[in-house]
From Swiss-Prot:
It comes from Hordeum vulgare. It comes from the Eukaryota. One of its GO terms (biological process) is defense response to bacterium. Five disulfide bonds are present. It holds the Pfam family Tryp_alpha_amyl. This is Hordoindoline-B2. InterPro entries: Allergen/soft/tryp_amyl_inhib, Bifun_inhib/LTP/seed_sf, Bifunc_inhib/LTP/seed_store, Glia_glutenin.
Length: 147
């Protein structure tokens, strides 16, 4: 019973936090700014960017396999980043940070967002995607907003 109550409380806090940031607009701090232009509501396909942030390689079609030794030896990082950059280039510059945040939102942190240093590292990787792709200034997500 106590566990059920805690789960309900966590769900309430998560939905309240999500609504708080959804109502206030995006966190797009690239050079062009958010301005008065609206970004599309549908989420763009940034699957490779999610894989890059999560340090995943796809070795078989639609079957994610994480190979840390292969990743750090450069076996697939470059290829995944290039695909991510190609996908990011299809998004308007003022919408890129919101799109990146939207794609990784909820994907980080393991159980109930608890992941320690790994989550921080993944958020940092997500924030620097635009500069890694030579597409402008890094994104800045709100501090303490770790999904």
């Amino acid at each position: 019973m106590k566990t059920l109550f805690l789960l309900a409380l966590l769900a309430l806090v998560a939905s309240t936090t999500s609504a708080q940031y959804s109502v206030g607009g995006g966190y797009n701090d690239v050079g062009g700014g958010g301005g008065s232009q609206q970004c599309p509501q549908e989420r763009p396909n940034l699957g490779s960017c999610k894989d890059y942030v999560m340090e995943r390689c796809f070795t078989m079609k639609d079957f994610p396999v994480t190979w840390p030794t292969k990743w750090w030896k450069g076996g697939c990082e470059h290829e995944v980043r290039e695909k991510c950059c190609q996908q990011l280039s299809q998004i308007a510059p003022h919408c890129r940070c919101d799109a990146i945040r939207g794609v990784i939102q909820g994907k980080l942190g393991g159980i109930f967002g608890i992941g320690g240093g790994a989550v921080f590292k993944q958020i940092q990787r997500a924030q620097i995607l635009p500069s890694k792709c030579n597409m402008g200034v890094d994104c800045r997500f709100p501090s303490g907003y770790y999904w």
